[in-house]
Design a protein with these regions (language model features):
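Positively charged n-region of N-terminal signal peptides that target proteins for export
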Residues: 1-5
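Non-catalytic, conformational "gating/processing" segments within enzyme and secreted inhibitor domains
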Residues: 49, 88-277, 296-389, 393
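Bacterial N-terminal signal peptides
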Residues: 7-16
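N-terminal, post-signal-peptide region of Sec/Tat-exported proteins
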Residues: 49-86
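Generic short beta-strand
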Residues: 403-405
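Mature N-terminal segment immediately following signal peptide/propeptide cleavage
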Residues: 32-46, 51-57
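A short acidic/small-residue loop/turn micro-motif
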Residues: 420-424
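Boundary at the C-terminal end of the N-terminal hydrophobic targeting segment
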Residues: 16-17, 21-25
């Protein structure tokens, strides 16, 4: 009998301005894996030309915990598809260091806003960041102690017992409530009804909640309706924020990159704007993890920025099919009998774990004060029976479809990655 494994990742983010000078040193194993999978999922897991936002960090955190229990060909396939390094010890260490860096950032006290950041210069609210991981496992199931010890030590993910056999629906409600609490009510009903059954054995969850104000707010009085050109060329009027100041900037082959920093300077919004109104598809073909890493340290220049306000709340993503199409088939027991998570729990031909689905849900809103975003991902496991620097001030009008990311500057990690085709 195969037992389902569910991995949930949730992330919420609230942000609000920053800059491209030099590329990062070689990105860490975790940062590279996060960004590379994000690029893959944006291209393969979402419909071209539509609004979308993913949390590559959230997705990878849950899958990295799952990977800690994989063995044999299942592990080999996951290594390739998830862009992991062969040195697994170093990989988990890298994810642990990234989690610590994010948690440390979220634990900093209230900062005094720079002049002009808040009217009157009063203290601004600090960046609020919570990163939480948890395992929800079947009560009494024989999970291997080394696996449990690794994910708790490295990912801060304790095991919470749930009796899926007696009442899978009650377990689903409990997990969704935990997700909702961690994401400040931005992510609700992550795991849909009937997704968990009496065969469910483990749900792996990552949650990130981030609320960060801009380093300098956009003046509310400057916001006005301006035309935004949709992918078919039609203009629509949308509320557009405007601000002039030092921001990161680079003019590259066919597009511009602008970074707008958040308070504290450890996070920024990256905007990748095609030069032409119909250039989004060509830009997405150029998108690579190396490009994202290079954009993490931009050159400061004087920018006149016009940026639309927007709010995105796509439905739950089911990522299993996309991960299969990328080559990660054995983890989903395809072909039957191939799933091998023996390092997570003892495997026999008639009783073993497999991934049944990976659920992911996001939320993001951007306005004059900052950005709020949330995401959640769940991996369910089931039991089975068999750059160029400008020299003059630059006007950047974000008035047609573009790509965006919320980046952790020092590592280049994309906490969120998406596209905006229609801000309405």
């Amino acid at each position: 009998m195969k037992l389902p494994l569910t991995s949930l990742l949730m992330a919420t983010l609230s942000l609000g301005a920053m800059p491209i000078s030099r590329a990062l040193e070689k990105p860490s194993a975790a940062a590279h894996a996060v960004n590379a999978l994000g690029v893959d999922l944006l291209a393969r897991g979402t419909a071209a030309g539509t609004n979308t936002v993913l949390s590559p960090y959230s997705i990878q955190s849950a899958l990295a915990m799952t990977y800690a229990g994989a063995a044999g060909d299942t592990r080999s396939q996951m290594t390739g598809v998830l862009h992991y390094s062969e040195d697994e010890t170093a990989l988990h260490q890298s994810f642990g260091e990234l989690r610590t860096a994010l948690e440390t950032m979220g634990a900093k006290p209230v900062e005094q806003a720079p002049a002009g950041a808040k009217k009157g210069g009063e203290p601004a609210q600090p960046v609020q960041l919570t990163v939480a991981n948890r395992l929800f496992g079947q009560q009494g199931y024989e999970f291997r102690p080394p696996f449990l010890e690794l994910v708790e030590r490295t990912y801060g993910a304790p095991l919470q017992s749930i009796d899926f056999i007696a009442n899978a629906e009650a377990g689903r409600v409990k997990i969704n409530n935990w997700v909702e609490e961690q994401t400040k009510q931005r992510i609700t009903d992550l795991i849909p009804g009937n997704a968990l059954t009496s065969d469910s054995r483990l749900v792996l969850v990552n949650a990130i909640h981030l609320k960060a104000p801009w380093a300098r707010e956009f003046p509310t009085r400057a916001t006005q309706p301006l035309p935004f050109h949709l992918k078919n060329g039609d203009p629509v009027e949308v509320d557009t924020m405007q601000r002039t100041g030092k921001m990161g900037y680079a003019k590259l082959d066919g597009f511009q990159a602008v970074t707008v920093p958040y308070l504290g300077g450890e996070l920024h919004l990256l905007v990748l704007l095609p030069e032409t109104r119909d250039g989004l598809a060509a830009l997405e073909k150029k998108l690579t993890p190396e490009l994202l890493a290079a954009c993490a340290s931009p050159t400061l220049t004087e920018i006149e920025l016009s940026l639309p306000k927007f709010k995105l709340e796509p439905p739950v993503f089911k990522l299993a099919e996309t991960l299969r199409s990328l080559g990660m088939t054995h983890a989903f027991d395809d072909p039957k009998g191939s799933a091998n998570f023996d390092r997570m729990a003892p495997r026999t031909p008639k009783d073993y774990l497999m991934i049944s689905e990976v659920f992911h849900k996001t939320y993001m809103a951007l306005d004059e004060k900052g950005t709020e975003a949330a995401a959640a991902t769940a991996v369910t496991m089931t039991r089975s029976t068999s750059l160029i620097e400008p020299t003059t001030p630059v006007a950047v009008r974000v008035d047609h479809p573009f790509l965006f990311a919320i980046q952790h500057r020092s590592s280049g990690t994309c906490l969120f990655l998406g596209r905006l085709c229609d801000p309405r």
